[in-house]
Design a protein with these regions (language model features):
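N-terminal strand-loop element at the rim of the active site
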Residues: 6-61
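A conserved mid-protein helix/loop that constitutes part of the nucleotide-sugar donor-binding site
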Residues: 14-22, 175, 179-201, 208-210, ...
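A charged, aromatic-enriched C-terminal amphipathic alpha-helix characteristic of glycosyltransferases
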Residues: 15, 314-344
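Short His-centered aromatic/hydrophobic patch
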Residues: 79-85, 101
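Acidic anion/phosphate-binding donor-loop and adjacent secondary structure
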Residues: 140-141, 149-174
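Aromatic "clamp/platform" in nucleotide-sugar-dependent glycosyltransferases that forms part
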Residues: 238, 257
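Short hydrophobic beta-strand element within catalytic cores of glycosyltransferases
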Residues: 274-277
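Conserved acidic donor-binding segment of nucleotide-sugar-dependent glycosyltransferases
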Residues: 289-300, 308-313
Length: 345
């Protein structure tokens, strides 16, 4: 049995953390023993809700990671962010090291201390998983990485798990639009509120669910009051199970400045909800224009597309039919896990 230590440097629970948990819960338990290793804080409820075994780090540094490695004795360390990858590289003589880059972050596209240190450690990685082609190609030191070391692997989710969780929530919801994500950079939540305000001028009784929390929550609340949108927006904060709310919405909106493959968009596809988003890297290949939703960097056009979907049942049915077909290959967890297993072997 192979022992896999999933190493994460933060105590939050967002996209990269969600991917790690998906991998842990979908690996063959007879062949793999997996543990989630990170500082424990905001992520605790999410991990326990998903029955994920974890090793708590009092602080994310070399000495605490060394203790965890000594205790668990992993065959593979799967590091899910830059900081975790750099620390993991120090144990390359003891374990196979997999570095997983989950986003096309702006600070990876230029010379910084982080990109420099990552460049120094890439020789210690057995494999680097990039969430998209442009995440790989945009990395400042990309040309220094050996050709066979990198693999592009788009995120996926288990549609069955999402729908099962949606059915566990017995509350009734009814929303036109849902935003599911952190209220912080690079999600651009203030832009979200501005777009909702534009939509309200055309679709007066619009109801929007905002699920998520973050450092920008207070300024988001101020913007909502300033624009008089209190009757149109419900702020749910973080939810352990947001999937009934998602399934009960007609459209998902994303306003991110950059993304990898956003998990919330995959969750929307699993729930048969069209996606309208800014033209971020990870969605360009998934949300083909007019097939599963719409992409634009113009606020007016984003608002216009959402209102068009809300006002046209025929359009909603057309998108729904397309999404149902696409879900089978976009959210193919079996294929994803097979690739991960090959990387571990």
């Amino acid at each position: 049995m192979k022992k896999i230590l999933h190493l994460i440097s933060q105590d939050k629970f967002s996209g990269a953390e969600n991917v790690a948990v998906q991998i842990i819960n979908n690996m063959d338990k007879e062949n793999y023993e997996s543990v989630y290793c990170a500082p424990i804080g905001d992520n605790k409820k999410q991990l326990e809700n998903r029955n994920v075994r974890y090793l708590k780090l009092d602080k994310f540094d070399y000495f605490n990671v060394k203790k965890a490695v000594k205790k668990f004795k992993p065959d593979v360390i799967h590091a899910h962010d830059i900081k975790a990858s750099i620390i993991a590289s120090l144990f390359y003589k003891k374990s196979k090291i997999i570095s997983h880059i989950h986003g096309n972050h702006e600070n990876m596209r230029k010379f910084t201390l982080k990109t420099f240190l990552y460049n120094l450690t890439t020789k210690k990685y057995d494999k680097i998983i990039w969430v998209s082609d442009s995440a790989k190609d945009s990395y400042y030191f990309n040309k220094n990485i050996q050709g066979d070391k990198s693999i592009v692997l788009y995120n996926t989710i288990s549609s069955e798990d999402i729908l099962k969780k949606a059915n566990e929530d017995k509350n009734d919801y009814k929303f036109d639009v849902i935003y599911l994500g952190r209220l912080a950079y690079p999600k651009d939540p203030l832009r979200l509120i501005e777009i909702i305000n534009i939509m309200k001028q055309k679709y007066h009784n619009i109801k929007v669910a905002i699920v998520g929390d973050g450092q920008d929550r207070k300024i988001v609340e101020e913007k909502i009051r300033e624009l008089g949108l209190e009757e149109n927006i419900v702020l749910f904060g973080n939810m352990l199970n947001p999937y009934k709310v998602l399934k009960s919405s007609k459209v998902m909106i994303l306003t991110s400045i950059y993304e990898g493959t956003p998990m919330c968009a995959l969750e929307a596809i699993a729930c048969n909800v069209p996606v309208v988003s800014t033209r971020v890297d990870g969605l360009i290949k998934i949300i083909k224009q007019g097939e599963l939703g719409y992409l634009s960097n113009d606020n007016e056009e984003l608002a216009e597309k959402i209102v068009y979907i809300l006002e046209n049942e025929k359009e909603r049915k057309r998108l729904s039919k397309n999404i149902e077909k696409a879900n089978k290959y976009i959210n193919n967890m079996e294929k994803y896990i097979m690739t991960i297993s090959e990387i571990y072997s």
